[in-house]
Amino acid sequence: MSNVPNELKYSKEHEWLRKEADGTYTVGITEHAQELLGDMVFVDLPDVGTTVNAGDDCAVAESVKAASDIYAPVSGEIVAVNDALSDSPELVNSEPYGQGWIFKIKASDEAEVAALLDASAYEALLEDE
């Protein structure tokens, strides 16, 4: 089974969310998602300053197998993107919960964060797939 860190929140679309000390949230795709996609060749990042709604497609992960939309797990403003992915998209594969993060968002509604899946609920979702 894929690694599912307890401290993160998860979406049903296989994005993860981690609260940072400054109150923003870092977003990436889960180990499960990157395993399904295979080796990353390109990540199309959102523009900093863009306002998104929960569920909006805001980035694209392109792998040797497919291109897959990455969805905003919560509504808010994109405040940073992982520029390292431009030169090293494989970080999404090698460090999905670390250096392979996709973007940071300032959430506009904390209730959306609370409504995301915890690690045990996400693990149950994976077992049902």
Curated annotation (Swiss-Prot):
Entry GO terms, CC: cytosol; glycine cleavage complex
SUPFAM superfamilies xrefs: Single hybrid motif
Superkingdom in the source lineage: Bacteria
GO BP term, example: glycine decarboxylation via glycine cleavage system
UniProt cofactor note: Binds 1 lipoyl cofactor covalently.
Positions of post-translational N6-lipoyllysine modification: 65
Gene3D superfamilies recorded: 2.40.50.100
Record has Cytoplasm as a keyword: no
Cofactors (names): (R)-lipoate
Entry keyword annotation includes Lipid biosynthesis: no
Keywords: Lipoyl
Residue stretches making up the Lipoyl-binding domain: 24-106
Family under the similarity heading: Belongs to the GcvH family.
Subunit structure: The glycine cleavage system is composed of four proteins: P, T, L and H.
Function summary: The glycine cleavage system catalyzes the degradation of glycine. The H protein shuttles the methylamine group of glycine from the P protein to the T protein.
Classification via PANTHER family: GLYCINE CLEAVAGE SYSTEM H PROTEIN, GLYCINE CLEAVAGE SYSTEM H PROTEIN-RELATED
Name of the protein in question: Glycine cleavage system H protein
The organism of origin for this protein: Cronobacter sakazakii (strain ATCC BAA-894)
